[in-house]
């Protein structure tokens, strides 16, 4: 009986792997599909616009934040539209880009924040994780982009604080590490002007972020009135906070979603009055390999009831795609230092 149970588990595991490989191949075939001119027929609000129209609202020199984490809740339509506008018109240019979580594809996957890693388009990149953003790292290596790293927790506090007029955060995080300007470089990995976003003050570090002008985030669905729903998204991260910050700073808040639903005030959502633009991308993804039109429940709040199986499936996907960094002893030690 025990042997039979084990064999059944192996069979299920093999079936899972075969299905996941099928998903990988299907995703590879469609991973750069997009319709940047799409408008939903059922829209009522005039806040609905195409991806290209939304990109045209971003001014030169703006500070832009994109929400999301790794391959989850990516703002792909915005990345593509901004890049294509820049390649066609040379605008917007000189952007500062903020990304709390790692949002790159290690130079392998399209539709990540690496799309805007073009010389002159983004001239300063601030993030809590830069290893996956190979295009940004290459620009910094060429001396064309200022690169800054900050702790993710302090970044989210700063973003939330901007909505309340708070411009800095004091913390002991990072003391006596490379983030401490007294013994390291502070936030600056490379900065052409010697600027820094971290300052020492006794037994605390003082962290800062530039004021957010444009907030971009990925929701699941919108209703015809322009409310954006966060059901079935893989990550929410700092979506609410970045929208509130941009609005408080007199800037723009824009969302991309995967489809339309009827209005439902009982569901978690960002209300239409907080948004300046809503873009519908029929190819929008909940996460890598999972279109928003067919969300994977294991990525949704509450999961699918089998967390262990979900974790094993994710590990297998990561081994196949090799998009998630593999951390060695040095990276682990740096992580421990930064989290003291």
Q: Model segments located where?
A:
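Conserved alpha/beta enzyme-core scaffold
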Residues: 2-340
């Amino acid at each position: 009986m025990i042997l039979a149970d084990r064999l059944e588990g192996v069979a299920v595991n093999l079936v899972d792997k075969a299905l996941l490989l099928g998903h990988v191949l299907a995703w590879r075939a469609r991973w750069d599909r997009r319709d940047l001119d799409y408008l939903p027929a059922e829209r009522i609000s005039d806040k609905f616009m195409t991806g290209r129209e939304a990109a045209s609202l971003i001014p030169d020199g703006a500070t832009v934040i994109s929400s999301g984490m790794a391959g989850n809740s990516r703002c792909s339509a915005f990345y593509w539209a901004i890049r294509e506008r820049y390649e066609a018109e040379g605008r917007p240019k000189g952007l500062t880009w903020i990304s709390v979580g790692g949002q790159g594809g290690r130079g392998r996957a399209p539709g990540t924040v690496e799309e805007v890693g073009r010389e002159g388009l983004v001239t300063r990149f601030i993030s809590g994780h830069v290893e996956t953003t190979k295009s940004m790292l290459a620009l910094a290596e060429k001396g064309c982009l200022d690169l800054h790293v900050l702790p993710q927790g302090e970044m989210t506090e700063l973003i939330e604080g901007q909505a309340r007029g708070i411009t800095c955060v004091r913390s002991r995080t990072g003391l006596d590490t490379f983030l401490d300007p007294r013994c390291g470089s502070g936030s600056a990995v490379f900065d052409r002007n010697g600027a820094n976003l971290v300052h020492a003050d006794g037994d605390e570090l003082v962290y800062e972020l530039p004021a957010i002008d444009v907030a971009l985030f990925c929701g699941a669905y919108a209703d015809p009135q322009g409310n954006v729903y966060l059901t079935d998204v893989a990550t929410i991260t700092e979506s609410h906070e970045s929208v509130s910050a941009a609005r408080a700073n007199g800037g723009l808040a824009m969302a991309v979603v995967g489809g339309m639903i009827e209005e439902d005030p009982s569901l978690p959502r960002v209300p239409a009055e907080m948004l300046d633009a809503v873009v519908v991308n029929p190819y929008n993804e909940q996460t890598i390999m999972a279109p928003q039109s067919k969300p994977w429940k294991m990525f949704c709040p509450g999961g699918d009831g089998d967390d262990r199986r979900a974790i094993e499936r994710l590990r297998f996907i990561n081994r196949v795609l090799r998009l998630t960094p593999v951390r060695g002893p040095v990276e682990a030690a740096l992580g421990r230092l930064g989290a003291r």
